[in-house]
Curated annotation (Swiss-Prot):
Signal peptide: none annotated. Keywords: Calcium, Hydrolase, Metal-binding. Its EC number is 3.1.6.1. This is Arylsulfatase. CDD domains: sulfatase_like. It comes from Clostridium perfringens (strain 13 / Type A). PROSITE patterns: SULFATASE_2. The modification 3-oxoalanine (Cys) is found at residue 51. Pfam families: Sulfatase (PF00884). It is an enzyme of class 3 (hydrolase). Belongs to the sulfatase family.
Amino acid sequence: MKPNIVLIMVDQMRGDCLGVNGNEFIETPNLDMMATEGYNFENAYTAVPSCIASRASILTGMSQKSHGRVGYEDGVSWNYENTIASEFSKAGYHTQCIGKMHVYPERNLCGFHNIMLHDGYLHFARNKEGKASTQIEQCDDYLKWFREKKGHNVDLIDIGLDCNSWVSRPWGYEENLHPTNWVVNESIDFLRRRDPSKPFFLKMSFVRPHSPLDPPKFYFDMYKDEDLPEPLMGDWANKEDEENRGKDINCVKGIINKKALKRAKAAYYGSITHIDHQIGRFLIALSEYGKLNNTIFLFVSDHGDMMGDHNWFRKGIPYEGSARVPFFIYDPGNLLKGKKGKVFDEVLELRDIMPTLLDFAHISIPDSVEGLSLKDLIEERNSTWRDYIHGEHSFGEDSNHYIVTKKDKFLWFSQRGEEQYFDLEKDPKELTNLINSEEYKERIDYLRKILIKELEGREEGYTDGNKLLKGYPVSTLKHIR
């Protein structure tokens, strides 16, 4: 039988928030084991670092220019002919997604046979006068289950935390009622009710560590009194709190009270450790069903979280905290016959997930897919790989583009004409902006030309073919609007 495939996706987890990736403060024993005994990719990026667009890259295997989502915009229909789920389904796999989809309409199966949905608290779906839904339970299976357990009046907002807030506190109910536990509950139940005559493709999609920052008390307490590192602060960072932005609990930039920020990081780390332990629970269950050694796992996040670095928060910007993600493959049965424990430095993007997993299952990759399969890299066959990724995000005054390679990164903020350059080999934390350095002038010019080439013909008018222009940012390109 073909291998089972499990795609484990978390939301808003930084690439540096794994012990195996050098973080000495966070405890991620199960994930560390999986990455150490598998194949770890240290230069994985999201081309559009926010929830919807990044999920489109994973779902379709396309670049942002092709799937059309270059910023954050709810309510735009998902009508893609070929998706990762549709290809597995057509190939005879039993396909299931549990957790966050963040598509529109919310119940769009996108090729899965079934979805058990919890997108978290989404303002768009909660708008009782909007077009999404006036009955939130219709698009949230977790909330329906939660109310069956605790009463029809309980709600996701009961503990007073917003879905983008830096305010944190422990989960207010029993640990086994947390959304993180629910994803694993339903994933284990899928093992019971799946078609045993077919291989399966399971997407386990956690809402955390995305806000609300509300891990169960045990996990919050693990970090609340720890001397966690201060946020990174580059020589280019704005040290002023413009218009008191840091007082906004949903701010994307500003200066936040140090005590509150420390609690936020404790809750963020606690949420990740909670996910780690629940993934360990799923591995035990899968082993009990006798399927562990015939299953290949891919773990990834949709984007990261700045968590106060350089006085930025959340995502949508091209810095490492926002754009670089954890990415590893775990193959306990050694089905891929690669050199387990290897760390790769190739530049990856989320569009590479679909062709990689289809390749693992010996399923044909549709012509619409622009990502690259990692199978040849893992099997150490001769293979060519891309030199760079072009990333972007429509974001008002902070709309941005970036070109990242193994060794450096060029950034351009289109609406204010600001450029930055970081030597990631010498400065992986992006502390020194070298845009005006004579030593790097030739390299900067080269990367700028690459960006100009990437933007030629775009509807926003970002270039005339010779230089970068301010343009008019949009969140979705016209071919999908």
